[in-house]
Amino acid sequence: MAISIKTSEDIEKMRVAGRLAAEVLEMIEPYIKPGVTTGELDRICNDYIVNEQHAISACLGYHGYPKSVCISINEVVCHGIPDDAKHLKDGDIVNIDVTVIKDEFHGDTSKMFIVGKPTILGERLCRVTQESLYLGIKMVKPGIRLRTIGAAIQKYAEGEGFSVVREYCGHGIGRGFHEEPQVLHYDADDGGVVLQPGMTFTIEPMLNAGDYRIRTMKDGWTVKTKDRSLSAQYEHTIVVTENGCEILTLRKDDTIPAIITHDE
């Protein structure tokens, strides 16, 4: 497994790409309201990426994906395709997943939005999913096994009564959208990967309110929970530092510091 170690110049470019991706999620928030279509949200994001940020949407055309962002509602786990016929409604939980390319480097991030008045379950699932991401990020430092992080996320999520999707995971990122290693959010063989300074990857747990099993729709992209239960996901791109990590896609609404250090 060839895991690339980024140079300081690479990391600086990834800070820029990561900041741009985060800014898309900050920009779109006021538009998330009952009645808006996911197609309209996609166009707003694309216009902002192309015309304001002078960047590229990594999703558009990736393996034939037809839109600029992924918008996944309620029981949709990931890769929901924006559609002018799909209107948001009160109580929906919505994930928007954005990946921006700037100067050849990628920034990848997603967050949950709650439309109008939240349901108790929807709000709790979103909160626990974000907390599981933060838990994983706070563990990142040189010398730790990736498997340790996945096991901790799984234990926390299941302790809260939720399940962790198995088929999708975090990934290395840089010049490539998806690089080595795979970052699993549950306890499984990680190929012995030990973190080193300069590694860049995403952590992006997907938690279901019901069973962890999923199914892919006929469009070949949209993934839903098999039991139709709600699903939530949060994602950040991070870099391993000499004594911890730095979040490259931090937003103003995040409640975790950008730089996390361990003083052992």
From Swiss-Prot:
GO terms for molecular function: initiator methionyl aminopeptidase activity; metal ion binding; metalloaminopeptidase activity. Binds 2 divalent metal cations per subunit. Has a high-affinity and a low affinity metal-binding site. The true nature of the physiological cofactor is under debate. The enzyme is active with cobalt, zinc, manganese or divalent iron ions. Most likely, methionine aminopeptidases function as mononuclear Fe(2+)-metalloproteases under physiological conditions, and the catalytically relevant metal-binding site has been assigned to the histidine-containing high-affinity site. It comes from the Bacteria. The gene is map. Gene3D superfamilies: Creatinase/methionine aminopeptidase superfamily. Removes the N-terminal methionine from nascent proteins. The N-terminal methionine is often cleaved when the second residue in the primary sequence is small and uncharged (Met-Ala-, Cys, Gly, Pro, Ser, Thr, or Val). Requires deformylation of the N(alpha)-formylated initiator methionine before it can be hydrolyzed. PANTHER family: METHIONINE AMINOPEPTIDASE (PTHR43330:SF27). GO terms for biological process: proteolysis. Its EC number is 3.4.11.18. The keyword Protease applies. Monomer. InterPro entries: Creatinase/aminopeptidase-like, Pept_M24, Pept_M24_MAP, Pept_M24A_MAP1. Keywords: Aminopeptidase, Hydrolase, Metal-binding, Protease. SUPFAM superfamilies: Creatinase/aminopeptidase. GO terms for cellular component: cytosol. The keyword Protease applies. A divalent metal cation 2 binds at residues 108, 171, 204, 235. Belongs to the peptidase M24A family. Methionine aminopeptidase type 1 subfamily. This is Methionine aminopeptidase. It is an enzyme of class 3 (hydrolase). It catalyses: Release of N-terminal amino acids, preferentially methionine, from peptides and arylamides.
